[in-house]
Amino acid sequence: LLDIETGTQEVVGDFPGMTFAPRFSPDGKKIIMSFAKDGKSDIYTMDLENRIVERITNHPSIDTSPSYSPNGKFIAFNSDRSGYQQIYIMKSDGTNVKRISFGNGIYGTPVWSPRGDLIAFTKLHKGNFYIGVMRTDGSGERLLTENYYQEAPSWSPNGRVLIFYRETKTNAKGEGFSAKLWSIDLTGYNERLVETQTDASDPSWSSLLST
């Protein structure tokens, strides 16, 4: 954990493997994360007050990128339990797991919208990456933007804009790459470069800022 006011850092948990893709629960009392060990990955939560860790999924597959619904009752995540990465939702206790993505391609990085009615995602199809949205039952899939490589969408607090990062080739020979932040309206219009002093990736929108 990093205190953005003081700069103080704290290591929480001592896992005998690799933890990644952490997110806070809506009430800020828990962290949800992926924990990888022995070639598989499952989803865990940690209570920030008592440091109790709870295993949410236990499946011989790779379960990653968990994201809470705004009310904290559901979790979206991606898993290769169907053979390749797709998006699933489940109750916050790990029960009632349902696959919701059925389009062509590989899906990842699902993120619940602030209103709880949509899930943003990354999709890889025919060599290109897309940022898209779908309803929480998997219907109404819309692809908003396409590029050589882009992922990690994050919602604006008002639910109208997505920010993500995109890698582009720095020369015609493809010998170098540059990672920058971009935003796009939920309509699929107004795609904009977000200026940063250096390369940037994996954005997360502050709940204190809106557009």
Predicted regions and their residues:
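Sequence signature of WD/YWTD-type beta-propeller architectures
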Residues: 1-211
